Amino acid sequence: MTAITNIAAREILDSRGNPTVEVDVLLEDGSFGRAAVPSGASTGAHEAVELRDGDKSRYNGKGVLKAVDAVQSEILDAIGGMDAEDQVAVDEAMIALDGTPNKARLGANAILGVSLAVAKAAAETAGLPLYRYVGGVQGRVLPVPMMNIVNGGAHADNPIDFQEFMVMPVGATSLSDAVRMGAEIFHTLKSALKKAGHNTNVGDEGGFAPNLPSAEAALDFVMESINAAGFKPGSDVVLALDCAATEFFKDGAYRYEGEGQTRSIEQQVDYLAKLTEAYPILSIEDGMSEDDWEGWKLLTDRIGSRVQLVGDDLFVTNVERLARGIETGTANSILVKVNQIGSLTETLAAVDMAQRAGYTAVMSHRSGETEDSTIADLAVATNCGQIKTGSLARSDRLAKYNQLIRIEEGLGAQALYAGRSAIRQLAGR
C-alpha cells in the first residue's frame, strides 16, 4: 500500500527567479507528496553539492534539468517499489546510488526533493500532518522566529557587511502572537527608515536593505523600532545576528569592505563581544569564518556562556563537522538547513546529535526559497524551539509563518510556544 510507484520532477523557479527542483512522489494507495528544494546565496564550502546544468544558453547556466533527469531515471529505478514509510532505507539507497561524499553526482537538490516528497506522501498515507508524522506525539513545541528585518552582505546591495539583523519575540505568549509582534516591529521600522530618508526596498529574505554605514547603525534602527512598536528590548524581544563572516574573511583577516575596516581574528572576537554588551544580542550566527576553528573557539570561550553561537557554514548540517565542534567545545548551536546535507534522514540525525550534546538547533530556510513550507513542520517535529525563515514580507517567507500558525491551531491546547526557554543563555534570566 505504501510502495513508491512513480516519481515526477520538474524545473520551477525560486524566489530569486532561478531554477530549482520540484518533486512529486506517488504511492500505491494513491497518496501523494510534493516538495520543492531551496537554494542559498552565501553557501559554505562544505555543503552538499547543488547540481546545476552549466548550460549558459539556459538560465545563465543555472538550469537543473540534469537533477530533474536524475530523479526520473536513476533515482526512480533505484527506489521505485520501496516502502515510503521506511524513510531511512529510501534515503540511504539514494545516498549509496550517488556514491560521492557530497552528493555531487546526482545532486543534493535531486536527492533532497525526493526525500522530502517521500516523507510527505507517507504522512498522507498515515492520515497525519507532516510534523506529527515525523515528530510523533512529542512534536508540539512552536519555535521562536528569528525575523530578519534588516539585510546586508550577500543578501543586499548596501555597505553593511553583516548579512542579517533579526528580532526574536521571546516574550510572546504564542507563535501567532510572535508573528504579530514581528510584523508590528517590521512596519514600524519601515516608517522609521522612510522618515530618515532611507529607501525601504527589501532584500532576498524580505528584510529592508537601507544604505547604512555600519552594523551599529542598523542595530540602532532596530532598537528604535522595537521601542516605538511598544515592546521592551531584552525582555519582550531580543536581537540576533548572522554575520556570515566567511564572506569577508580573506588572507587570515576579517575585511569589512563596506565599512572600510580590517579586523584580525582576535579583533573580530573583541568586536562581537562589545556588540553583545552594547545591545541585547542573544544569538550570533557565523561570527567567525567556516574554517577559522581557532577564532570560533576564542569566541565561544569569550561569550558562549551568555550568547547562543550558531554554526551555519561551520557545521553545514553535517554530523562529522558537528561532532568536531562538540568535541572541541566550539559554538553551542547548529543552524539546520535541509539542503546543506541533502536528505531528511541526515537532517534529523544532525538535530538529534546537537540536542544530545546540549547544543540548540535552529531550523532554517535559504535565501532562494519557494512556497514550500516543509521546514515549518520540521521545526515543530524536532522541537528545536527556533526557526529562521526571513522577514514579514515576501510570500515565500510568509508561507512558513502561515504554516506555523496553522500547526499551532491544529495542536490546540497541546501547543507550547518555546519563548525564552528556546535560548539556553536566556532561559535562566
From Swiss-Prot:
Pfam families linked to this entry: Enolase_C, Enolase_N
Molecular function, one GO term: magnesium ion binding
Alphabetical list of SMART domains matching this protein: Enolase_C, Enolase_N
Metabolic or biological pathway, per its Swiss-Prot or TrEMBL entry: Carbohydrate degradation; glycolysis; pyruvate from D-glyceraldehyde 3-phosphate: step 4/5
Residues reported in the UniProt entry to bind Mg(2+): 242, 285, 312
GO biological process, one term: glycolytic process
One Gene Ontology cellular component: phosphopyruvate hydratase complex
Annotated (2R)-2-phosphoglycerate binding sites: 163, 337, 366-367, 388
Keywords: Cytoplasm, Glycolysis, Lyase, Magnesium, Metal-binding, Secreted
PROSITE patterns the record matches: ENOLASE
Matches recorded under CDD domains: enolase (cd03313)
Intracellular or extracellular location(s): Cytoplasm; Secreted; Cell surface
Catalytic activity: (2R)-2-phosphoglycerate = phosphoenolpyruvate + H2O
Broad class of the protein's primary localization: cytoplasm
Family listed: Belongs to the enolase family.
NCBIfam families in UniProt: eno
Listed HAMAP family: Enolase
Functional summary from the UniProt entry: Catalyzes the reversible conversion of 2-phosphoglycerate (2-PG) into phosphoenolpyruvate (PEP). It is essential for the degradation of carbohydrates via glycolysis.
Protein name: Enolase
Species: Methylorubrum extorquens (strain PA1)
Gene: eno
